Amino acid sequence: MKTFALALGGGGARGLAHIPVTEALDDLGVKPAAIAGTSIGALVGAAYAAGMRGKDIRRHVIALAHNRGEITRRLIAARAGTLADLFTGAFGQATQLDAEKFCAQFLPEAVPQDFAALQIPLTVIATDLHRRQEAVFTSGPLRPALAGSIAIPGLFRPVAIGSGILVDGGATNPLPFDQVRERAGVTIAVDVFGMPELERNDIPSVWESMFTTLQIMGSAIAAAKHKHAPADLMIRPNVTIFRMLDFYQASAILRAADAVKAEVKEKLGALLAA
């Protein structure tokens, strides 16, 4: 049987749709030879590479999503600054999140501190802000790399690793199937950007406008890459109706994405057996 590599893209809360894909792999009884992830895809990828089963990742997410008080407590603990910063001119510090603290608060305990402790090789994608290029992490401290990968400008404070200042990996490689193409015989990519919403004509909030713009940019980058050198299997869960920060709707997102399980099992199974 052929080997396969798995690429999980960014997309905020829509990225919870990666979880049913991992459950489908568990149902098939197969594991990827390598995983690459950007932003939320890096977080799910890290949990899966650490040895968690898809159903256990789902259980962790739902337990948090159904406890708003606990989410609020953890978000407060993950702030980059304090309320006092509002009155000392450091407004951004008070309103932004610290991505490393966020990972410490929300990642499952099974996710280790170092890449070396993972059961499956993992590639994490971030963006080096000042060098204006993709930053690729495959070894060393894991959680700082994950923090850099999720550091959406405006929401998170940029993350410093070595001489690099990192922001969200979606700015340079939102769906990193190219990073694992040579690692296996088959490459599967999971696109959670969503489809155009032709029936909408409402004026979105400031945050939604910004995040949707990032999604459009990411989708365009991924589409261009796929046209140039496509992944062997592209999976697109139907999660368009959800917004980037709809984490409280985790159960609904997972239900909507469950439909891809059959597609993954049928199409990937055929590719691996060919």
Regions found by a protein language model. Name each.
Residues M1-T38, A46-A274:
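Patatin-like phospholipase
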